[in-house]
Amino acid sequence: MEITVVKGDITEQDVDVIVNAANPGLLGGGGVDGAIHQAAGPDLLKECQEVINRIGTCPAGEAVITSAGDLQASYIIHAVGPIWKDGEHQEANKLASCYWKALDLAAGKELTSIAFPNISTGVYGFPKKLAAEVALYTVRKWAEEEYDTSIEEIRFVCFDEENLKLYNKLINSEVV
């Protein structure tokens, strides 16, 4: 399994599934969430509304999967990251859960490639370095435990230069 880091637009990634940094209502918003909803087209919003009607809101640390609308990917996994308060409200655990559950959903569909944004590091205010450490630790731990998986590539798609530098530094570190 290959873990890669790129700078770019998550909506343009040539992968089986992209992960959306969603809000609990799954109805789009700003940042990555808004960009994905806009690029995927109106059918995504309709499908997300159906999911919410069925399950209610999606709490932080949880994830659901939908089709990808007009995107190149086949699916979108909507992972609801935590809002950073002070680090004393299980924020790191909830963030790790987003990555773990997204990987479980992708593996459950026998997909081979998944692209993650930098979940919770925008308006949700999660410290970028800690978020990168949690993300890389979690996907590596998942890969160790789920070694017999269809997933061949886990890609982190960084929107900004700061996250790109953090991920590139940490990906080569044995600490994470």
Curated annotation (Swiss-Prot):
<dbReference type="Pfam" id="PF01661">
    <property type="entry name" value="Macro"/>
</dbReference>
<comment type="similarity">
    <text>Belongs to the MacroD-type family.</text>
</comment>
<feature type="domain" description="Macro">
    <location>
        <begin position="1"/>
        <end position="175"/>
    </location>
</feature>
<protein>
    <recommendedName>
        <fullName>Macro domain-containing protein LMOf2365_2748</fullName>
    </recommendedName>
</protein>
<dbReference type="InterPro" id="IPR043472">
    <property type="entry name" value="Macro_dom-like"/>
</dbReference>
<dbReference type="InterPro" id="IPR002589">
    <property type="entry name" value="Macro_dom"/>
</dbReference>
